[in-house]
Design a protein with these regions (language model features):
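N-terminally biased helix-coil "hinge/interface" segments that flank
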Residues: 1-197
C-alpha cells in the first residue's frame, strides 16, 4: 500500500501539472506500464534491471554478444551477464529467498557501493555496510567527507577521471582522497598508501 499510494500520488501530481504523457513505471522484466497496470512485485530490483538494459544496448552498439555488467551505485553493486545478446534471467525469479512465478534478470547485488565507508579493525580492512550518503559524500567530493570510501579508492586507482566525473560537473579532489586513505586506512594498519589501495 505505501508504494501504491506514492505512485498514484505522483501520477495525480503530473496530471495536475497537465503533462501530456502518463507516468510509466519501469519493471524488472524490462518493460514499463502505467501505475494502474503495475504490480509491486514487478518493480522489485527494476533499477538494476534498467542498468542491464543499458548494458545490453551498449553491447549491441559495440558488437559484443557476451558481456559482464558491473554497475556500482552509491550503496550497492549489481553484477549481471549478457550471453548471446540476451540478459541472463531466471525463469522463476527470487525475491528475498522466495520463488515467484515471474521471470527476472539474474543479477547479483552486493551491499557495497561507491559511498560505502572503508574502516579498519583487528582483522584488516572492512567495507560497509555504513555509507556516507550523498552528503557529505566521499572525501574526494570536497564537501566535508572524512571517511574513506570506494569512490576515493577508485579515484586514486585511476578508475575515475577527476576532471570528467559526473559529466565534468564535479571535479574530484585526489589530494583529499589520498589524505583520508592514508589517515584512516594505511596508517592504522602500518601500510603504505599504495598497499592500502
Amino acid at each position: 500500500p505505501p508504494m501504491e499510494r506514492f505512485l498514484y500520488s505522483a501520477d495525480h501530481r503530473l496530471k495536475d501539472y497537465k503533462t501530456k504523457n502518463p507516468l510509466l513505471i519501469f519493471r524488472n522484466d524490462g518493460g514499463s506500464a502505467r501505475v494502474a497496470k503495475t504490480m509491486a512485485v514487478k518493480t522489485y530490483s527494476s533499477g538494476p534491471c534498467g542498468g542491464m538494459q543499458g548494458a545490453k544496448a551498449l553491447a549491441i552498439h559495440y558488437g559484443f554478444n557476451h558481456l559482464i555488467s558491473y554497475d556500482v551505485g552509491g550503496t550497492t553493486t549489481d553484477i549481471g551477464v549478457i550471453t548471446d545478446g540476451a540478459i541472463n534471467e531466471r525463469r522463476r525469479g527470487i525475491i528475498e529467498g522466495i520463488d515467484i512465478s515471474f521471470p527476472m534478470p539474474n543479477i547479483y547485488s552486493a551491499g557495497v557501493g561507491g559511498s560505502s565507508i572503508i574502516t579498519t579493525d583487528e582483522h584488516g580492512i572492512c567495507i560497509g555496510p555504513q555509507s556516507v550518503g550523498a552528503a557529505p559524500g566521499p572525501a574526494c567530493f570536497g564537501y566535508g567527507g572524512k571517511d574513506a570510501t570506494i569512490t576515493d579508492v577508485f579515484l586514486l586507482l585511476g578508475v575515475f577521471d577527476p576532471a570528467r566525473y559526473f559529466g565534468g560537473k564535479l571535479t574530484l579532489d585526489a589530494e583529499r582522497a589520498l589524505d583520508v586513505i592514508t589517515t584512516t586506512i594505511a596508517t592504522p594498519l602500518a601500510l603504505s598508501t599504495f598497499d592500502a589501495l
